[in-house]
A protein has these predicted regions:
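Feature marks short, highly hydrophobic, charge-poor N-terminal signal-anchor/signal peptide-like helices
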Residues: 1-9
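Charged, low-complexity intrinsically disordered regions
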Residues: 32-50, 56-233
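Transmembrane-cytosolic junction motif
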Residues: 15-40
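Alpha-helical membrane-embedded segments
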Residues: 8-16
C-alpha cells in the first residue's frame, strides 16, 4: 500500500470522526434546549452540568462508590440537570454516563431525593433476572431475603442491616416496584436515587436515554418510590 493511499485513509478517518463528533455535539445541544424548556414547564431549575459539591454527595450510593465493580464511579459525564426544592424535599434529575462511554445512548436517567423524612440504611436494589438470582443464591450471594415472590424473582437487595431494610419495604412498595421493574434504587441516610440502570453483563434491558415525552410519567413513579420509603411527615 502506497504512502498516498495510507495518508488518504488517515484523512478520511479524521474527517468522519470530526463529522460524527459534530453531529453528536449538535444533538446534545438540541436535547439540552428541550430539557431547559421542560424544566420551565415543571417549575424546576435547569443547568447543563453538575457542580463538584453535588458529585461528592453521590459517592454515598453503592451505584457510584463500588470500587470492586465495573459499574462503580459512573461520574464521568453528567448532563441536563433539573432541580427543585419543595416542602423540604430536594429533587434532582440528571443523565449520567459510564466513565469513558461518552454520551449517545449510554446515559442513565437518575432521580435524586434528599429529605429529613428519609432515614435509610445503606441499601441497593438491583434488577436481576431469575436465572442470575438462582446462580448467586447457589453461592450464598443472594442478598437480603425478601418475602415477596414477584419482587424476589426480579430484584437483588444488598444491605448490611437486613432487619431494617425488611421493615422499610412495605407490601405496597414491593407490589409497586415489582410492577414497574425498570427501576433500580439506592438509599443511604437522608438521600436516595431512583434510576434506570445499564449493566455491561446484559442483566437489564434499560439501555437507552429517557424519552422526554415520558419524563413526567417516569418522574411521578420515582416520586412514588420516594414516598413509599420516607417517614410520614
Amino acid at each position: 500500500m502506497s504512502i498516498g493511499v495510507i495518508l488518504f485513509l488517515i484523512f478520511t478517518i479524521f474527517v468522519l470522526t470530526q463529522y460524527f463528533r459534530f453531529r453528536s455535539k449538535k444533538h446534545e445541544q438540541q436535547r439540552s434546549k428541550l430539557f431547559q424548556r421542560l424544566a420551565g414547564q415543571m417549575g424546576m431549575q435547569f443547568s447543563a452540568k453538575m457542580g463538584s459539591d453535588f458529585r461528592k454527595r453521590l459517592k454515598a450510593f453503592n451505584r457510584f462508590n463500588n470500587r470492586t465493580h465495573r459499574q462503580g464511579h459512573r461520574l464521568s459525564t453528567i448532563r441536563n440537570v433539573l432541580r427543585n426544592n419543595v416542602n423540604g424535599v430536594e429533587t434532582l434529575f440528571f443523565e449520567c454516563s459510564p466513565r469513558g462511554a461518552g454520551t449517545g445512548r449510554n446515559m442513565e436517567p437518575i432521580f435524586y431525593f434528599k429529605s429529613s423524612s428519609l432515614n435509610l440504611p445503606n441499601f441497593h436494589i438491583r434488577h436481576f433476572n431469575i436465572h442470575q438470582n438462582l446462580f448467586l443464591k447457589s453461592f450464598g450471594k443472594g442478598g437480603v431475603q425478601i418475602d415477596h415472590a414477584a419482587f424476589s424473582q426480579k430484584y437483588l437487595v444488598q444491605c448490611s442491616d437486613e432487619n431494617t431494610v425488611r421493615k422499610l419495604f412495605s407490601d405496597e412498595f414491593l407490589d409497586f416496584i415489582s410492577s414497574n421493574d425498570s427501576f433500580d434504587v439506592d438509599g443511604n441516610g437522608d438521600q436516595m436515587i431512583v434510576y434506570r440502570a445499564m449493566y455491561e453483563d446484559g442483566s437489564t434491558n434499560n439501555i437507552g436515554r429517557i424519552d422526554l415525552n415520558e419524563f413526567k410519567d417516569v418522574k411521578q413513579k420515582a416520586v412514588k418510590v420516594y414516598k413509599y420509603l420516607s417517614r410520614p411527615g
